[in-house]
């Protein structure tokens, strides 16, 4: 049985840990609001741009001059999974849930005889995926040194993806990230980027015909690479908000658990101390009676 000194050390250690988790919770809460506002502000632009491009692409999809980012390679053999995760842990299941979704997709594709490659953005995703897919990871980008996420970061990733696509390294690219819903809810999401998926018009909607100048193909050649960067930037912002939400929730749970441990350890300490005092009193009384 542990001595009273060991128990005091354990209680003090748990209290110190509780202070750390409480501080991390407060830091995450302060950063969450800004990250949430950035993610929510990016959604309308990204969704509207996707809708505009889908409208233009609907008319150009069948033309022989359609951009390759829209038309694709005509094959469905090599898949690139662009997996965006965080740079740090202590955030509950935030990173592992994204990796799990990507891993499930990879196994499903491999069972169909497809070739799977990984493009990792974020240290935690890379560390988890390399355990089983080390030889299939073709690139890894870490954003640890980036203090404030900017569109330039997404553009850099998009340019590297497009360069590999133009080199014929893959046929289909799918983006994996975590969509922020609330502090306690982040949704792992998969979104196909290449070739662009043109959404069918909603049932009952009236199709509107537009005339474009210059031609649709020329407009798409400019807009498609930018849309790729916009969708990646949106994913990075969603991930950022999801990370702080998950970390805030995880640190809150850790703080509560530390409080429960302190109460239990203190109760055991007091009972042990009381038992030792009672034992000593009995020994003193027994000795006095013997005299």
From Swiss-Prot:
Primary site of residence: membrane
TM spans (from-to): none
Similarity comment text for this entry: Belongs to the ATPase gamma chain family.
Protein name listed in UniProt: ATP synthase gamma chain
Protein's membrane topology: Peripheral membrane protein
Provenance organism: Rhodopseudomonas palustris (strain BisB5)
Matching NCBIfam families: ATPsyn_F1gamma, PRK05621.1-4
GO annotation (BP), single: proton motive force-driven plasma membrane ATP synthesis
Quaternary structure annotation from Swiss-Prot or TrEMBL: F-type ATPases have 2 components, CF(1) - the catalytic core - and CF(0) - the membrane proton channel. CF(1) has five subunits: alpha(3), beta(3), gamma(1), delta(1), epsilon(1). CF(0) has three main subunits: a, b and c.
Lineage: superkingdom: Bacteria
């Amino acid at each position: 049985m542990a001595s009273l000194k060991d128990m005091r050390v354990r209680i003090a250690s748990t209290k110190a840990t509780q202070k750390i988790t409480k501080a991390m919770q407060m830091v995450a809460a302060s950063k969450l609001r800004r990250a949430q506002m950035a993610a929510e502000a990016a959604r309308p632009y990204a969704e509207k741009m996707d809708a505009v491009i889908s409208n233009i692409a609907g008319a150009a999809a069948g033309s022989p001059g359609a951009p390759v980012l829209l038309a694709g390679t005509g094959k469905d053999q090599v898949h690139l999974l662009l997996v965006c995760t965080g740079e740090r842990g202590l955030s509950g299941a935030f990173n592992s849930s994204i990796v799990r979704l990507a891993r499930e997709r990879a196994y499903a594709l491999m069972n169909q005889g497809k070739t799977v490659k990984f493009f990792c953005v974020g240290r935690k995703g890379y560390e988890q995926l390399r355990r089983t897919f080390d030889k299939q990871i073709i690139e890894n980008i870490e954003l640890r040194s980036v203090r404030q996420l900017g569109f330039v970061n997404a553009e850099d990733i998009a340019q590297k993806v497009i360069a590999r696509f133009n080199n014929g390294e893959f046929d289909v690219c799918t983006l994996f990230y975590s969509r922020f819903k609330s502090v306690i809810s982040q949704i792992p999401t998969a979104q196909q980027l290449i070739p662009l998926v043109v959404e069918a018009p909603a049932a009952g909607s009236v199709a509107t015909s537009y005339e474009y100048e210059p031609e649709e193909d020329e407009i798409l050649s400019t807009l498609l690479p930018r849309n790729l960067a916009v969708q990646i930037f949106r994913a990075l912002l969603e991930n950022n908000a999801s990370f702080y939400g998950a970390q805030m929730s995880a640190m809150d749970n850790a703080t509560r658990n530390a409080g429960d441990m302190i109460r239990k350890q203190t109760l055991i300490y007091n009972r042990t101390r009381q038992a030792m005092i009672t034992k000593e009193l009995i020994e003193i009384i027994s000795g006095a009676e013997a005299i």
